[in-house]
């Protein structure tokens, strides 16, 4: 393998290791990077990566400091150390490393001892450098009032900066603000536009939302086939709400042929995830014999689960079923 990087142009890995052993920090970083590629956590190569990255980082190598800081955040690693992660990420961030600034913000935001105010500082630095991930993260902080006063207008501003760069989560978050009219005038058409952008990149929440929009005709022309298409996309990623709505569409023949068995299977899939709406729909099917024999005992058990969940009042359905038993 041949590397091309400054002092190590056109050198083999053995030649770079030789330079690294003599104290060349660029060579040390490259060796650390080499061992870090796809290495299993706590494997021999992972230990070598730590060793060489730390040597380079201690000499002030910015990329090594960033990489080392990131490695200290790895879950399940025996080296995981929040304080060391912050220490090395801050070293790199202070040298102007934008990715380190965002990673430092994330570690301060989501780490063992959250410090939202400091996280905002580092997100801001990275966001102002144009980094879409940091812009989305900063938007989230303003939206939720973490480390700053809640400000939907600023959340909207930063989400839009990231969304325009194609950041899928930001596109979804921007759509949420248009949907709810927070930080911007409510606009269902623009909400649907951004949900679709995000959904096309695989965002599960956006896939569910654009399916809902097509189903209800909100911000787009009603289109049951498109609704089913996107519900299935969301369901493939584990969206329980999509399971329920697919079941409903099969039950009522929306975008597909009416199919009680398919409806029952999708409702059951959601019910297994403890979804009360799915319990209710299954109870109805058992109660009235929709696609299966009437089973009042099963219907009653499901109605009682719904009632216990507090999500809807089904006391009348319970009484009616009890009267039939």
Curated annotation (Swiss-Prot):
Pfam families: Sel1 (PF08238). It comes from the Bacteria. SMART domains: SEL1. This is Sel1-repeat-containing protein YbeQ. PANTHER family: ERAD-ASSOCIATED E3 UBIQUITIN-PROTEIN LIGASE COMPONENT HRD3, SEL-1-LIKE PROTEIN. To E.coli YbeT. It comes from Escherichia coli (strain K12). GO terms for biological process: response to oxidative stress. The keyword Lipoprotein does not apply. Keywords: Repeat. Sel1-like repeats lie at residues 26-61, 63-97, 103-130, 132-167, 168-203, 205-239, 242-275, 280-305.
